[in-house]
Structures are given as structure tokens and as C-alpha cells.
Amino acid sequence: MEKSTVYFTDFRCPVGTSQLDKLKKLCVAAGIRDIDMDGKFVAIKMHFGELGNLAFLRPNYAKAVADICKEQGGLPFLTDCNTLYPGSRKNALEHLDCANLNGFNTITTGCQIIIGDGLRGTDEIEVPVVNGEYCKTALIGHAIIDADIFISLSHFKGHEATGFGGALKNIGMGCGSRAGKMQQHASGKPAINEEVCRGCKRCAKECGSDAITYVNKKAVIDYDKCKGCGRCIGACSFDAVYNPNSSANEILDRKMAEYAQAVCHGRPHFHIVLVQDISPNCDCHGENDAPILPDIGMFASFDPVALDQACADACLKATPIENSQLGEHLSEPGWHCHHDHFKDSNPNVEWKATLDQAEKIGLGTREYELKKIK
């Protein structure tokens, strides 16, 4: 497969310009106007942020993309699917309220918001996964599959299970219905290290399945109830919750790539990633820790695999922020440095597996040419 082209622009803005101007210029340079959108429904997949989290992308960026689509005669809408876990996005009504409270509405974004898998997260379509090894079919939000054109607008950040979240995670995990998310997470279930557990009960508060109780002030997981979503792993500040299946995160990564294939295959698709506010964990948390790396810039491509690879490469070249989760880990006496910012921030991740699987099944290539736009 030939190299894909990834376009990049940094966040420097001379007086009289703005980041929104640069985003539009980036999208145009990357070829978004080559897509015939006239009279067609355009799904713009993004994350509206959990209430309390402030690292998610601002609605202004969504409006910039929606405006480009409308200029081309498209009928854009913002979309995401419901979550497995507790919080403010587990059904469509709460999800829409969350989006509004975080600034996403028809005025701020210039388009409608549709929750992709409906009221309860059950409005899904079973879609074949071309070349799928782990998933022969994927359960994708109905509204997302109904769209003629698919665009992803992603915030690049760290992630406690997948290493980082970029385009492929936004597409693969994000477009899965609640059952689809469960299918991806089913590779392994967490365990408790009782020697480290403080009995703080934070993991139980994050569990959407009521699977965690306490015996003698130590967490206990009911595996009949546990869905394997991994929220408890990210919730624990003491590393008491872990995944005993060393291959579980890798399988999750590979399933996620196959779900992304199901979403993109057979229709025009285009992808944008903003590498800023690079928090160590997912925007699904009701908080965001300090960034582990400095802001880098905006990337766009027709190839989500090359796009994520380019974003990851840029992050790996960046200097860690000292006062961050990554910086603290690197300064710990005896810390085993992986020379990999994502693994040094969250040691149990296997992020390269997502890119490897996505390339293997033909979604894109990890080989790319980077073109900088001023």
C-alpha cells in the first residue's frame, strides 16, 4: 500500500487569524471539498465530554467543520453513541443534556445533534467487518450507518486501556452501540490487588454494573455482573485495580480497529484530530488531569490509520510535562522507562496493536507523508 498523506498545522496564530481559520484551511488542503456532499447526510462523530471534564474539544471546532459541510450542500449532524458506564451519557436524554451543558447545541455548532444508538443505546445495525479476525460483525449506532458520509473529529489524549484515544478509538469504540461497546470490552475483566487497595470506594462509584462491593474494606468484583469496561482501572489512584489478562488490552485494541473498519467501509470518510490538552486518561472521566505533553497541533487525512500514527509519532517526539502523571512516573526512583510516553503514563497498554490491526485488515496504512500547512 502506498503512503497516505497526512496534513498538519500548529496552533500558532498571527494577529487577525484564528485556530478556526487554520482548521478550515487544513481541512480544505487535506481534500474535504473533494467529497460530494450535495444533499447528503454527513455524520460528524465527536465526543461531547463527560460532565466535569474540560479536556474535550470546544463546540467551535465542530461548527467550523459543519460549516464546511453546509458550504458544500451537505446536511451535517453531530453524533455519538451512549456509554456502558454511569455518568451523564448513558441514555440519549442525559447525553443530550450533557452535550448542551458542555456547550454543544444548534446555535454553537450550526447543526443538529443526534445520539447514534437511540434512547437506550439499543438502536443499532449489525454491520459486516471486512477482513475481521476478532469481530465478524459490529453493532453500530443506527443513525451513524444511515449517514451517507462519515467524518470523525477527535481529541487526541492518553487512555488507561488503549494507550491513547485518537481517530480510531473515536470511530471504533465511539460508534459502537452499548452492546457493541460490550463486545469490544469483553476480552478481559479486571482484578483487585488487595495489598494495595485502600477501600476508598472510588472504583465502585465508577462501576455502571454495580459489580463492586467491599469485604473487610477491600474491593471485591462480582464477575457475573462485570462487563469488563475498565472504568474501575482508570478510577483507582493506587493501581489496585488491574487487568490480569496480559493480552486483554491488545484484544480490545484490535477489536476497536475492526469496529472502525465497519463504520468507514463502503462510503466516503474523512478524519480530523486535534492534539491538545493531552490528558493522561479518556474524556469519559468526570475530570481531567493535567496534560502529559504540550499542545502540538491539528491533523487531517482520509486515512485514519496514518492519521493516528502521525499523531502518535508527534507525541512521542514531544517533551513530557514535569508536573503531570507522565512526568511523575518518569521521576519515580526505580521507574522502568519504556521510552514510550503512552506506556510510561499507563504501563499496561498495547497501543500499537490498534494501528497494526487496522492496517492488516485494510482500513489504511501506517506509512505516511506529512505535509505542513501554515
Predicted regions and their residues:
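Extended, low-polarity segments enriched in aliphatic/aromatic residues
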Residues: E2-N53, L57-Y61, E71-D80, Y85-K374
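Terminal amphipathic helices with adjacent charged low-complexity linkers/tails
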Residues: A66-D67
